[in-house]
């Protein structure tokens, strides 16, 4: 009886924490039912992940009990992630670095079945469960870092990766790191994004600090920013342009075409449901080689 009580209490505690201050559940994509992904011949998929959690009975129980969007829409299990990568490889996906993704976009022509893998926040689950899979298959990826919180052990209930762990990933040559703001990834009262609600002056200072950190520590930086919660407005785009940021990424269920606005480049938030109903059904994987 005692082990069951311990599991139940632990589940309730995690459930409360998960629903209390979720880091990533405001964007419109998470609130819509999955639809068929529109296909255009000259396009690429930007696949975004947040958590790659270990599959175990407790996590499954919490997911079932809570119906939490943080778990359902922002997480895949390690088994699901590995299966998704294997499926993409089996269907001849051309995995791109961010540098290659930008190069093809600017040239106006993506290779067939182009896929760019990227992660927001970079918490411990990415190091534990995604990094080994990508390393095994030699697949490049981009991590968007909240640069003032590298190594934070309780950032909105997340354990973010340490610099030592990020350095290890970077040194493989498979990873590049970009900005997810320096210290503006949070929600204010009324579920307002701290980044969007900040003044241009505050946003500019934050961007400069984040870029300074990245240029100093991970100089393959492409001067890109993934928006907290996938949300952006024209005012913040002005601040980005003033401070040399050339590319900005949202969260939308759309493939990327060369003519996409460089400050509103869509990324598909990957859950297992989204992968099954959107990615596997995308007509781009049926193109002749």
From Swiss-Prot:
Subcellular location as annotated: Secreted, Cell wall
Range of residues in the leader sequence: 1-30
Phenotype of the disrupted gene, per the record: Deletion of icaB leads to shedding of the PIA polymer from the cell surface to the culture filtrate, and an inability to support biofilm formation. Deacetylated PIA is not observed in the mutant strains. Furthermore, these strains are unable to form biofilms, show significantly higher sensitivity to the effects of antibacterial peptides, their adhesion to epithelial cells is significantly lower than that of the wild-type, their phagocytosis by human neutrophils is highly increased, and their persistence is significantly impaired in a murine model of device-related infection.
GO-annotated cellular components: extracellular region
GO molecular function: hydrolase activity, acting on carbon-nitrogen (but not peptide) bonds, in linear amides
The keyword Secreted is annotated on this UniProt entry: yes
Domain of life of the source: Bacteria
InterPro entries reported in the protein's UniProt record: Glyco_hydro/deAcase_b/a-brl, NODB_dom, PNAG_deacetylase, Polysacch_Deacetylase
Effect on the protein upon substituting residue 236 to R: In strain: 97-337
PROSITE patterns: NODB
Protein's UniProt keywords contain Endoplasmic reticulum: no
Family, per entry: Belongs to the polysaccharide deacetylase family.
Function: Catalyzes the N-deacetylation of poly-beta-1,6-N-acetyl-D-glucosamine (PNAG, also referred to as PIA), a biofilm adhesin polysaccharide. In fact, the IcaB deacetylase converts 15 to 20% of the GlcNAc residues of PNAG to glucosamine. N-deacetylation is crucial for attachment of the polysaccharide to the bacterial cell surface; it leads to the introduction of positive charges in the otherwise neutral PIA polymer, allowing electrostatic interactions.
Descriptive protein name: Poly-beta-1,6-N-acetyl-D-glucosamine N-deacetylase
